[in-house]
Amino acid sequence: MTDKQNRIHALICSVVTYLKAHRSCLSGVDITLDKLGGMNLSDERRIDIPPQSTRHDEVLRNAIAGIVAPELVEIAACLKAAKDDLVWREDNAQFYQQGADLGKGYTKCNLHTLLIGLDACGYHHPDFSLGIFMLGPRTLYRDHNHEAPELYLNLSEKSGWRFGASDWEDYPAGSLIWNASGAPHATRVYEQPFISIFIWLENVNSRCNLVHCDDWEEIEHELAGLGSCCFQT
């Protein structure tokens, strides 16, 4: 195996280790670990494809540098080591219906890479995705849902989340978020970029759907002009 493949494998293992330490915290963690436990992640199944850099490299480096929580030290070190081995892609609304308006902030700076999944750089899987997701500072990831059940492991120090009609709530680094199939959710990013582990457990080819809320423009204006100090949590 190549050094690159070993670094990607180590990154996957660091995520699995964290999830195992938080088994039973959320139903989604147990389901995810069961799925991963049934996969063949042996050396001979590793993929070796060329890396792909990104125009958002400076934001990405800042996001990784901002992973400072002690419980995330292993993931942070492995991600830093493997960053230039990964295939980084932008979402240009290809996961949404044609014409979906995702907002200027999201369009300006979003990034993801798959470690396990379709077109992944670690291991191929036809109906499971595990990867890294990043958003630029002061971004609203508008309310949306999807058929794929989703687990987030937040790596950033703070990010705001809204689930359905609930109020916004801030979540710290190391927090786990479970979005059941079809459950609406939104994310707001403050002065520092947002970075997380994301996992889609099935239905990875399903589309995302915007769930309209009347306050999108107001939130985006506040994020762009004032930062997180204007929000009550």
Name each model feature, range by range:
Residues 125-127, 151-153, 165-184:
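Short acidic-glycine-tyrosine-enriched beta hairpin
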